[in-house]
């Protein structure tokens, strides 16, 4: 079976635009929630999840072959494509959850009419190579693509030595997921998730001994 573990690495205080990046991502999610709430009737008619996602992206992202119906690209220019797609996925999940709860309320299976809240606590994911780059082995740094208020740029980030030592000792050689930015107690962290394959004991439950 698979076991997923995660660990948050503290980002040392420095003059980098983490707050700007978090804010612009949440603003994008809020905007998209409104868009998908407005267009849910047509989106919900698409049964295949990937096709629904593609249509949701076509609604807001302009390409040579696609004219977007909504002005997301103008409001959030140059947003990295992976981050835009993460925002779309989060917004779709929020609207889908609301619609499910609304249907339960209408069927009298849920007390209290649910509300669709555009305010959110979504945190950006830093996809490897395009948003996140690891430093050389043994160094307590990384590079993140952050929003400085005008553009998306690469910034060096200093990470807490004790946290990095723990990862190197505990998870060396294991593949981590793309890190997610977190904020707790006025501090910022990069949270990494690791997946392990664990073999279950074949001994019958009644014969297992807990030491």
For the regions a language model picked out, list residue spans one by one:
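Nucleic-acid substrate recognition interfaces
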Residues: 1-211
